[in-house]
Amino acid sequence: MTSFYIMLLAAYLIGAIPTGVVLTRLVGASDIRNSGSGNIGATNVYRVAGKKLGVLTLIGDALKGAVPVLIAIKLTDLGDAQVGAVAAAAFIGHCYPVYLKFKGGKGVATALGIFLVLSPLAVLGAFAVFALLVWKWRYVSLGSICAAAAIPILVYFTEGNPALVATTMFISLIVICRHHQNIQRLLNGSENRFKA
């Protein structure tokens, strides 16, 4: 049981590393929290600091979710529910990082990393939803919200594991809730469109 609590703490601290803030500081760019949308995630980094840093932020944020879950699965004897808790801890770390006074990102990329480990097949379906919506309407937020809503259903049909379904439902609900401002902007027509 001690190893489980250590894994939870480690997952949270790894998830809390603010990839976008670190990368933009390393290249001498402005504080991402004070630029663009103010979000620390890959989309805002892409808009403010360019494609390269945006992609690196996406990869880094995804790895923050994937690595703790992979370690929990491959190097420990934790059960499915405990692995789900480790995944949730990494995700919460990104959304509420101790290093930034608990003001973090929306969790999409970190959730992606987690889901890629837990259910890669479901991710393919969710990515199709995301890509179609972004291609059609150019709203990353809309694609993210709808993909988050879809993935628990996809996990249910591809995995059928109650613990994994519960984990994805928990993470997806937070992702959607953390897009509340985007939802408001989508409704009033003021949301920023993605430009390649």
Curated annotation (Swiss-Prot):
- TM ranges are 4-24, 53-73, 78-98, 114-134, 140-160
Q: How does it sit in the membrane?
A: Multi-pass membrane protein
Identify the main location. Answer: membrane
Give the record's GO biological process terms: phospholipid biosynthetic process
* Keywords annotated in UniProt: Cell inner membrane, Cell membrane, Lipid biosynthesis, Lipid metabolism, Membrane, Phospholipid biosynthesis, Phospholipid metabolism, Transferase, Transmembrane, Transmembrane helix
Q: Which InterPro entries match?
A: G3P_acylTferase_PlsY
UniProt pathway annotation: Lipid metabolism; phospholipid metabolism
Q: What is its EC number?
A: 2.3.1.275
Q: Which Pfam families match?
A: G3P_acyltransf
| This protein's record includes keyword Zinc | no
A cellular component annotation (GO) from this entry: plasma membrane
Where does the protein end up? Cell inner membrane
State if Iron is listed as a keyword: no
Q: Which reaction does it catalyse?
A: an acyl phosphate + sn-glycerol 3-phosphate = a 1-acyl-sn-glycero-3-phosphate + phosphate
- List, in alphabetical order, the Gene Ontology terms for molecular function in this entry: acyl-phosphate glycerol-3-phosphate acyltransferase activity
Q: Quaternary state and partners of this protein?
A: Probably interacts with PlsX.
Q: Tell me the function of this protein.
A: Catalyzes the transfer of an acyl group from acyl-phosphate (acyl-PO(4)) to glycerol-3-phosphate (G3P) to form lysophosphatidic acid (LPA). This enzyme utilizes acyl-phosphate as fatty acyl donor, but not acyl-CoA or acyl-ACP.
> What does the sequence similarity comment in the record state about its family?
Belongs to the PlsY family.
The protein depicted here goes by the name Glycerol-3-phosphate acyltransferase
Query: Source organism lineage?
Result: Bacteria, Pseudomonadati, Thermodesulfobacteriota, Desulfuromonadia, Desulfuromonadales
What gene name is given for the protein in this entry? Answer: plsY
